[in-house]
Structure formats: C-alpha cells, structure tokens
Amino acid sequence: MTFRPLHDRVLVRRVEAEEKTAGGIIIPDSAKEKPAEGIVVAVGSGARAENGTITPLDVKANDRVLFGKWSGTEVKVDGEDLLIMKESDILGVIG
C-alpha cells in the first residue's frame, strides 16, 4: 500500500534510539524514550492558502528531521509504525 499525505502533512519513520549511553550503560526498553528524530518517508503537496495557492513544503523524502517529543500521530502503514505530522511540527532538518 502506498500512502501520500495530504496538504502540509509529512510521513516520518522514527530513527531507533541508542541501546546504551555514552558511558556504556545499557538502557532497557522500558526506560527508553521515543526518539524525536526521524527520516521523512513522504510529503504532501503543500499548504493551501485561503486564496487557493499552494506553498510547497521545505522538507522532502529522505530528509533527516528533528521534531517535538509529542508531535504527530502514530499510524501503521504496511505493518510499519510511522508518524504523520504537520510540517510545522518539524523543528529542523539535520545535515
């Protein structure tokens, strides 16, 4: 199944969190926080203004992005857990 977000929405795959700290302590699954970093899978066509013009999004597929801890809605596409969020929930592009 292919999924295409509408308007200014973005589909993001979370990047897996580190298994251990910089000091070498292994973090159990129950103590891990969900990462606020991910890879853009798909983007919508853009934000629609009141006059009908469409402004394209700044992010594109395969961009590595940072987003707020509580951003987006979790969805399952082809058995994979992904996030769908508005572009404004994205804090920035890495690299």
Swiss-Prot record:
Keywords: Chaperone, Cytoplasm
PROSITE patterns: CHAPERONINS_CPN10
Gene3D superfamilies: GroES chaperonin
Protein's UniProt keywords contain Cytoplasm: yes
Gene Ontology molecular functions: ATP binding; metal ion binding; protein folding chaperone; protein-folding chaperone binding; unfolded protein binding
Cited Pfam families: Cpn10
Assembly and oligomerization: Heptamer of 7 subunits arranged in a ring. Interacts with the chaperonin GroEL.
Function: Together with the chaperonin GroEL, plays an essential role in assisting protein folding. The GroEL-GroES system forms a nano-cage that allows encapsulation of the non-native substrate proteins and provides a physical environment optimized to promote and accelerate protein folding. GroES binds to the apical surface of the GroEL ring, thereby capping the opening of the GroEL channel.
Family designation: Belongs to the GroES chaperonin family.
Record's protein name: Co-chaperonin GroES
Species in which this protein is naturally found: Novosphingobium aromaticivorans (strain ATCC 700278 / DSM 12444 / CCUG 56034 / CIP 105152 / NBRC 16084 / F199)
Gene: groES
